[in-house]
UniProtKB/Swiss-Prot annotation:
Family: Belongs to the IF-1 family.
PROSITE patterns found in the cross-reference section: S1_IF1_TYPE (PS50832)
GO molecular function: ribosome binding; rRNA binding; translation initiation factor activity
Protein name: Translation initiation factor IF-1
Every S1-like domain range: 1-71
Domain of life: Bacteria
Length: 71
């Protein structure tokens, strides 16, 4: 699977979970579990409750995603 197959959504962080994982409500009212991308961990970018984030998801599992950008 290439990067072209990934789907991007914008959402809001609802809940902070352990291990850099978050419950995110997407703009289409779905709630998913998302983890922080490696570059965000490496650069120590903090994500707080209520932050607007961009989430990248695979079309095979629409319940999990990866946070790639904080707005």
């Amino acid at each position: 699977m290439s990067k072209d197959d990934l789907i991007q959504f914008t959402g809001t962080v609802l809940e902070l979970l352990p291990n850099a994982t978050f419950r995110v409500k997407l703009e289409n009212d779905y709630v998913i579990i998302a983890h922080t991308s490696g570059r965000m961990r490496k650069n120590r970018i903090r994500i707080l409750l209520g932050d607007k984030v961009t989430v990248e998801m695979t079309p095979y599992d629409l319940t999990k995603g990866r946070v790639i950008h904080r707005h």
